[in-house]
Swiss-Prot record:
Family affiliation: Belongs to the spermidine/spermine synthase family.
Descriptive protein name: Polyamine aminopropyltransferase
Organism: Thermoplasma acidophilum (strain ATCC 25905 / DSM 1728 / JCM 9062 / NBRC 15155 / AMRC-C165)
Residues reported in the UniProt entry to bind spermidine: 65, 90, 158-161
Annotated catalytic residues: 158 (proton acceptor)
Amino acid sequence: MKLIENWFSERYSDNLQLSFRVSDQLLSIKTDYQRIDLFDTYDFGKLLAIDGTVQLTERDEFIYHELITMVPYHLTPRPPENALIIGGGDGGAARRLIDLGLKHIVNVEIDDQVVEVSKRFFPSLSSAFNDSHVKLLIQDGIKYVKNTSEKFDLIIIDSTDPEGPAEGLFSKDFYNDTRKIMNEGAVIVSQSGSPFYQPKAIKLAYSGMREVFSDVRVYTGFIPTYPSGFWSFTVASPWTMKPRPVNMSGKYFNADVMEGSFRLPQFVKELIT
């Protein structure tokens, strides 16, 4: 990706984009699956983009990674001991689960170059892959879920948007396969896009999960570098989810966020009804 006057821009539509002033472009490669760009920005530190969309920045990655791990962590009947991450090649979700005390984490990433870029530029996140509690597999997550005999307390779909290699991660067939590898009381969570700019993504995740799981809920959070800053996650279980008391906090997550993130604006409620 070429810079225009030292700015990287993520285009949301033909009429709108979010731009970051950058001091340098550190990397631009085309893998077998996607294009990866790495920029050094003035306000947000290093920025990782895949196919032109922001995946994480040094300054605000903690928000996304806390939301996709710490919220579902508190929805299982007891603290989960093991987890499966599909995607998440930067290591941020695995790093957070280690901090939460999980004993066994399987992280399945389809593109080894995402892992290599993270090891080079985001060592605080990718250090998770050196931890004895984490098993990193470079393979197709959809095929892994279909073929594995392991079962999990928590399944995290930490993917790009529902297109290209990630499209199948939002399908009913995939959710059916995840249902088969869930321990009793387990939950599954997926990022589901911006309700404002990507309503199809949240509808796709919610409707797909509703066909498979009896309890499906949406929660949201504020992530400054994602489209609109307003981001959604969809969490589900074959069992009724009853939040456990929250006695911990992160930089973003706390007991108030655990409760408030499920309080949805009316237009979001209407998207999923």
